[in-house]
């Protein structure tokens, strides 16, 4: 509603003695001038600019006679000021203008500037006037004056002798006697006033009073703390004609403030609270409306230590009240008690170092024009002694503080047509929450407030029409789009009175003192009247509204002295020539637009409906307005000023289903009128015969139905929101009426629809009013999105930038910098809960189902469950009819039931879990439901619940179920958590945090995170688990870390063995199902020690039973195409090996993705080593390796010049380190030289492309080579054969042949390989001839293999070359300790030369070993 902005400003008064410091400020009725009182001084200040104009100083002699000045009161026309003094005198000062055309301050413009001296009202608006103060009259009332109050043309004065004086402004009593309060009868209401009691004691007098014009009486506070309301029975103001009413329960009143618009009397009390009363229309009694008080919950340390209420002031628009206390502090409240600001907490009360500040004490305050400023005279009071010396220097030059505010448009223009956007207006700028919209429409334009612009989002204007703007637009960020109001318009029309935004959020119009101006968010331009005389000739009286591209406003024409209704087109020039003008009979107070109708409320208490339509006659487009209907409201409205808002709505007590013509349901069904906080509805009277208009004559459409007598819908209403949009899916929300009720929160008048369009019961209500509390002040409602938008003050401390003794910067130390932030809140859970409380579960279900697509709907259900649980489970008394079972049953209707319950439980303390699960069901059953629904993450959350509520055995049992399911589904993160969880259960701990990674040199990790070293094969103790990143400096196959004590003291830990058994079982199942890809992911993600396990399972699970099935499954899993025979292969020179070396190197170069050489040094020593290693491998051992995944793109690379050997980049294939086919820079010499003499024919290129096409994706190739290496190290030669067949590389077969020749290999395995290859050969002959060429190539190796098999090597004799013991006797990580001279995957003939192999190549291969299966996506990337 109202929000503080920035720091307060300080206005310095003339230097004088501390005794002359100001203590009272009072604005004139127009709030253009301020009277400031000191003990013997009266000063007049101007509001804009805020400057001192004139000061009257009382001579010392007369000052002694009169006593010090106390209070000041302005005459309604601002020509006189009455000042009361301590000795009972009233001094009347006349304010006169200095003769001539002189001003105190004038703006100086350069020559040729557009501000012309001939502008109407130029001097009056731009210059501070020169005034004189002259004391004209002195009146002695012979008793201390307690209160002054201006009443119409008289001055009402209350004195301490218990008298009320009615004095004429010329200083005469007109012969009227003073009224003695003891003669005024008081009672609890007006009906019993004649027999009322008198005050009954002699020293009674009025301490404070204020006149209420709309109640025609005085709210008074007596010196004994009682409060009351005195009203004259007739127009005569005599003791006989006065009587009073008072509430019995207020005995500690201190001050009073009256709100004329809402007819409220706010009484400040000694307790620090404010009691707000209204008058009962029927009995005249004073009824308590609400209280304004700080709560212990919000302000635990200060709520009852504020002292008495000292001052209260309602804002000029009567929408907020500001309250101060005796011990300091300031708070701001809305009309019906919503707290907006309080300076007793947060950054206002505490410094940045945590020490407490003394609250600001306020001696006097007064609102400035339109509520943009609050003038405050502060008494710093008992400040800290360390800064008292600085404050003395401040007191020497007394000052006035100006607090700056920005406010919601709803305070002054509540009938704004766009109700889904928040628009705030400040003194010279506007804040709105749709800033991102314009950027996408016109990207070239840039805002001067670029810091308030969010990132570009989809334009909400794209769909056009009246559709709801997207959430991204209205909620996208916390910043505002700030529009600076045109300075040209402000100079002569300050202050801004009204503003409005159109339905699409593209255009804003503002109204100042005269005329109006509008701004486009798309073009970033203001449009002002070209003829300034036309602007200065109109005063907008009743606000303004947008209708499509038109601005509709009610104004007063000064020249013609005529009330008018005008319509201006946005796109045309701002000129009366393009306006449509309709004359009005009386002054328009409020204006609103609904669909194609304009509704106005006039000062004669009548409502007039107009139709508005677009007219395109001739070159100029205009809008035509015609009167449709007039409704007199004078019977129901005691004073026109009491009407806060008037709107046409489509809301009625009957739903569209029950109307005889459902299509009329969204038409103008009723008038909503906010009368002093009382919401009144007048519906169309459909009881008469003219319900249906059968003929479609346009004239008949003008015959509108009359309105029924008004019905009161709600009390204490501040704002109303409704929409005429229709949406069949969300009828509940769009046909509802939303009310803001201040401290009572919000209310919604919700329609109730029968299910499945059945006929409603006649005895059931078709609408229901549901109250609910929200934590923000609502400023807009997003109807479809079930959201309330608002704003909230935030503060920033800058006191640390200044030293304590720096008195000049004291304001920045005393006050935080205030900013306004956007906020929003979901309200759907409140409504659902209210419906369930009222046994309207069916309606709640319909409403919830219509909102189930909202992104925060799960949060809505969770909030509802959580709030009901907290309330009922913590209640001290038994609840006869608990709501929790109903809510639980309601939530089960939605698929998110399981998540909602567990999320609620996880956010609730453990003590409430039993109460929750007694209502929603046993957590074990819910866990099993999650497993059946394959919702493993939710099941994991239930596991934590079970761990706390059940014995460890039950937790372990359920954890095992979940772990096995997670393994099957490849949820690796969950698997890791489950392993930790299971281990924690076994060790009796509630939770075991993950081990902290040790520091590792980053030079060789290449940015990859490898999990293998985490060793989640948990038979070892936690302290032995190395958790570092994978060290590429170690040997390829085995990770680093002190894991040699694998079967050490913890080997009997049943929990670790239990987990290991599950991991082994899963690995065995994967291998038996030939799911090698899943096995690789499993090993890489969970750090499963695959090699050591395969060594043990070599003759069991790791044995290939059916080579053909394995081959087919690998082709399918790795997306590897079956080979085909190219048509040209018969004549291809490649087949005969003519260009085998060059072609092989070319193709192999394409398979060598440079990223795999993570940081392979291309230094000379490494090149030499690599060349020496490769020199031992003759080119004849290589076959064509076409392992490229890049397809046709790579063919271009064949034909482009290859990089020279001087390049720093290594292009060798890291994937082939397990064989002897790697290449480094040295080999490109041969390729480069041979390539220049080589000319490939078309058929040869076709052959190359065919070979490329028969390879699978690059990722698959990397993964297959990783697995090949693993199986080679583990000695699973049959799997190596299968992978070699898929890759179609005879070098792999050669390696296996070398291994079988050089070591004692299991004869059964060799026999299995031989049988398997024969089966593959048969299968290739019948089903897959594409394999035949490769099988023919490796025939010699197969024959050698047959010879070896016949030798029948003993099965147990096989050991990997590097292992001295069987795997059972060594640590699974023992491979790390092997020397570089032995490598299980290097053929025997190359073992000797492998000493020279760069260790970096092994590191690269190790990186490759771990990388392919890391994140389930198998993406390879270098960081």
Curated annotation (Swiss-Prot):
WD repeats lie at residues 64-103, 304-343. GO terms for molecular function: guanyl-nucleotide exchange factor activity; small GTPase binding. Present in kidney and various cell lines (at protein level). Widely expressed at low level. The modification Phosphoserine is found at residues 1015, 1017, 1019, 1037, 1172. The keyword Phosphoprotein applies. It is found in: Cytoplasm, Cytosol; Membrane. This is Guanine nucleotide exchange factor subunit RIC1. It comes from Homo sapiens. The lineage of its organism: Eukaryota, Metazoa, Chordata, Craniata, Vertebrata.
């Amino acid at each position: 509603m109202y929000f503080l902005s920035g720091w307060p400003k300080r206005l310095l008064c003339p230097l004088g003695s501390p005794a002359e410091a100001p203590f009272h400020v009072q604005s004139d009725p127009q709030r253009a001038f301020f009277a400031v009182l000191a003990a013997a001084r009266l000063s007049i200040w101007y509001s804009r600019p805020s400057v001192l104009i004139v000061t009257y100083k009382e001579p010392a002699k007369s000052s002694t006679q009169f006593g010090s000045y106390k209070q000041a009161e302005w005459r309604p026309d601002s020509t006189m000021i009455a000042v009361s003094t301590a000795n009972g005198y009233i001094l009347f000062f006349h304010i006169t203008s200095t003769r001539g055309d002189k001003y105190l301050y004038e703006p100086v413009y350069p020559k040729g500037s557009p501000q012309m001296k001939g502008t109407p009202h130029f001097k009056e608006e731009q210059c501070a006037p020169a005034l004189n103060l002259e004391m004209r009259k002195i009146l002695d009332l012979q008793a201390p004056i307690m209160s002054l109050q201006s009443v119409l043309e008289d001055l009402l004065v209350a004195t301490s002798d218990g008298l009320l004086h009615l004095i004429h402004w010329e200083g005469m009593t007109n012969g009227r006697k003073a009224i003695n309060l003891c003669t005024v009868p008081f009672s609890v209401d007006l009906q019993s006033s004649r027999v009322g009691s008198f005050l009954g004691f002699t020293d009674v007098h009025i301490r404070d009073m204020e006149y209420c014009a709309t109640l025609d009486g005085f709210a008074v506070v007596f010196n004994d703390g009682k409060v009351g309301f005195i009203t004259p029975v007739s127009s005569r103001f005599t003791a006989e004609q006065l009587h009073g009413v008072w509430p019995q329960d207020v005995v500690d009143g201190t001050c009073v403030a009256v709100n004329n618009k809402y007819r409220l009397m706010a009484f400040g009390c000694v307790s620090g609270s404010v009691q707000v009363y209204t008058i009962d229309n029927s009995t005249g009694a004073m009824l308590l409306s609400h209280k304004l008080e700080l709560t212990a919950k919000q302000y635990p340390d200060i709520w009852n230590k504020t002292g008495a209420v000292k001052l209260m002031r309602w804002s000029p628009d009567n929408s907020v009240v500001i309250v101060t206390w005796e011990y300091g502090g300031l708070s701001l409240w809305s009309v019906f008690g919503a707290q907006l600001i309080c300076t007793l907490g947060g950054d206002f009360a505490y410094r940045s170092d945590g020490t407490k500040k003394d609250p600001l004490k306020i001696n006097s305050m007064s609102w400035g024009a339109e509520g943009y400023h609050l003038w405050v005279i502060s008494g710093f009071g008992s400040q800290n002694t360390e800064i008292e010396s600085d404050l003395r220097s401040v007191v020497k030059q007394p000052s006035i503080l100006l607090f700056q505010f920005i406010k919601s448009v709803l305070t002054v223009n509540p009938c704004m047509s766009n109700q889904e956007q928040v628009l705030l207006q400040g003194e010279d700028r506007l804040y709105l929450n749709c800033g991102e919209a314009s950027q996408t429409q016109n990207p070239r334009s840039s805002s001067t407030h670029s810091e308030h612009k969010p990132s570009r989002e989809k334009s909400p204007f794209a769909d056009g029409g009246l559709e709801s703007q997207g959430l991204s637009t209205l909620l996208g960020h916390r910043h505002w789009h700030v529009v600076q109001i045109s300075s040209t318009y402000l100079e002569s029309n300050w202050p801004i009175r009204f503003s409005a935004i159109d339905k699409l959020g593209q255009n804003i119009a503002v109204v100042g003192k005269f005329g109006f101006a509008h701004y486009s968010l798309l073009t970033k331009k203001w449009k002002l009247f070209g003829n300034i005389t036309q602007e200065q000739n109109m005063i907008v009286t009743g606000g303004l509204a947008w209708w499509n591209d038109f601005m509709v406003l009610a104004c007063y024409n000064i020249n013609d002295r005529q009330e008018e209704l005008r319509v201006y087109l946005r796109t045309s020039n701002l000129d009366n020539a393009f306006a449509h003008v309709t004359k009005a009979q009386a002054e328009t107070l409020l204006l609103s637009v609904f669909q194609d109708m304009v509704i106005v409320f006039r000062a004669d208490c009548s409502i007039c409906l107009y139709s508005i339509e677009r007219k395109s006659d001739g070159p100029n487009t205009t809008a035509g307005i015609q009167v449709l209907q007039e409704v007199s409201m004078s019977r129901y409205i005691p004073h026109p000023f009491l009407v806060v808002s008037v709107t046409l709505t489509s809301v009625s007590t009957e739903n569209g289903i029950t109307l005889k013509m459902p299509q009329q349901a969204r038409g103008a069904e009723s008038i909503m009128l906010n009368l002093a906080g009382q919401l009144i509805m007048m519906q169309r009277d459909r009881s008469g015969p003219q319900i249906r208009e059968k003929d479609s004559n346009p004239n008949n459409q003008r015959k509108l139905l009359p309105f029924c007598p008004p019905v009161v819908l709600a009390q204490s209403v501040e704002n109303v929101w409704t929409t005429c949009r229709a949406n069949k899916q969300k009828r509940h929300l769009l046909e509802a009426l939303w009310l803001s009720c201040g401290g009572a929160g919000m209310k919604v008048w919700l329609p109730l629809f029968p299910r499945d369009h059945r006929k409603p019961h006649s005895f059931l209500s078709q609408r229901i009013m549901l109250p609910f509390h929200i934590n923000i002040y609502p400023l807009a409602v997003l109807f479809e999105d079930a959201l309330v938008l608002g704003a909230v003050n935030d503060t920033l401390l800058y006191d640390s930038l200044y030293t304590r003794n720096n008195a000049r910067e004291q304001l920045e130390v005393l006050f935080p910098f205030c900013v306004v932030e956007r906020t929003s809140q979901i309200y759907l859970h409140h409504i659902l809960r209210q419906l369930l409380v009222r046994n309207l579960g069916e309606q709640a279900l319909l409403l919830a189902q219509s909102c189930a697509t909202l992104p925060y709907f799960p949060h809505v259900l969770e909030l509802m469950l959580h709030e009901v649980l907290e309330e009922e489970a913590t209640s001290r008394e038994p609840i006869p009819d608990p709501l929790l079972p109903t809510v639980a049953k309601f939530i089960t209707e939605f698929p998110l039931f399981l998540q909602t319950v567990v999320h609620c439980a996880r956010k609730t303390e453990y003590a409430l879990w039993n109460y929750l699960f007694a209502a929603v069901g046993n957590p074990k059953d819910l866990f099993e439901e999650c497993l059946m629904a394959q919702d493993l993450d939710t099941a994991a959350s239930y596991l934590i619940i079970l761990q706390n509520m059940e014995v460890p055995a039950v937790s372990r049992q359920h954890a095992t179920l979940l772990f096995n399911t997670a393994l099957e589904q490849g949820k690796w993160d969950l698997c890791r958590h489950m392993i930790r969880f299971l281990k924690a259960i076994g060790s009796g701990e509630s939770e075991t945090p993950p081990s902290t990674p040790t520091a590792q040199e980053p030079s060789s990790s290449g940015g990859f995170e490898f999990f293998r070293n985490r060793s989640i094969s948990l038979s070892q103790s936690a302290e032995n688990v190395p958790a570092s990143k994978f060290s590429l400096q170690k040997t390829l196959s085995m990770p680093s870390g002190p894991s040699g004590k694998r079967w050490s003291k913890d080997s009997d830990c049943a929990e670790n063995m239990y987990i290991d058994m599950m991991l082994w079982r899963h690995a065995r199942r994967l291998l038996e199902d030939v799911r090698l890809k899943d096995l690789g992911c499993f090993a890489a993600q969970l750090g499963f020690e695959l090699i050591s396990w395969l060594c043990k399972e070599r003759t069991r699970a790791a044995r290939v039973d059916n080579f053909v099935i394995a081959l087919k499954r690998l082709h399918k899993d790795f997306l590897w195409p079956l080979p085909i025979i190219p048509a040209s292969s018969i004549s291809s020179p490649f087949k005969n090996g003519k260009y085998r070396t060059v072609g092989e190197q070319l193709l192999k170069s394409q398979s060598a993705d440079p990223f795999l050489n993570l940081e392979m040094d291309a230094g000379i020593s490494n090149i030499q080593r690599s060349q020496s290693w490769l020199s031992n491998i003759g080119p004849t051992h290589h076959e064509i390796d076409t392992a490229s995944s890049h397809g046709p793109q790579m063919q271009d690379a064949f034909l482009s010049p290859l990089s020279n050997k001087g390049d720093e980049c290594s292009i060798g294939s890291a994937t082939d380190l397990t064989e002897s086919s790697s290449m480094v820079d040295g080999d490109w010499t041969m390729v480069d030289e041979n390539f220049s003499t080589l000319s490939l024919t078309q058929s040869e290129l076709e052959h190359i492309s065919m070979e490329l096409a028969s390879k699978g994706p690059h990722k698959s190739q990397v993964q297959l080579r990783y697995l090949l290496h693993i199986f080679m190290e583990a000695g699973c030669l049959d799997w190596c054969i299968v992978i070699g067949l898929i890759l179609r590389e005879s070098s792999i077969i050669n390696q296996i042949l070398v291994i079988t020749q050089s070591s004692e290999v299991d004869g059964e395995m060799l026999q299995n390989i031989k049988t398997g290859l024969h089966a593959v050969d048969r299968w290739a002959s019948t089903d897959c001839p594409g394999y035949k060429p490769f099988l023919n190539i490796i025939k010699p190796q197969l024959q050698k293999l047959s010879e070896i098999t016949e030798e029948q090597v003993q099965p147990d004799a096989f050991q990997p070359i590097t292992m001295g013991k069987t795997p059972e006797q060594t640590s699974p990580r023992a491979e790390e300790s092997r020397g570089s001279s032995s490598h299980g995957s290097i053929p025997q003939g190359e073992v000797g030369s492998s000493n020279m192999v760069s260790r970096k190549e092994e590191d690269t291969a190790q990186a490759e070993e771990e990388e392919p299966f890391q994140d389930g996506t198998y993406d390879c990337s270098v960081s």
